[in-house]
Amino acid sequence: MPYATITEADHTLDLFDQVDALVPREPEGLVLLIRGRTERGVAVVSVWRSREESDRFFADHLAPALAQVVGDPIPAPLLSLGVSDVAVRGQVGVA
């Protein structure tokens, strides 16, 4: 079953770019990644083919990269959910 997380942290997009440089560019199982600024900092929405693939990426790649760049505490998802439907109507890229 597809799985999604929504995380918000009081960090900058530049900091997230530093983390991105340390993890695989196209991790196995990632379907969709949305990242943007919020009033608090940065929010990230990720959709995965399965919770197992999300958990594996977090444990093997993202948690170590976050610990290296951000330190503790590592931001925990605000929300995680089993996904019943994913619809992408066209590819959108924003710099």
Task: Please describe what each predicted stretch is.
Residues 1-45, 49-63, 70-95:
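Short S/T/G/P-rich N-terminal loop/turn motif that feeds into the first structured element of a domain
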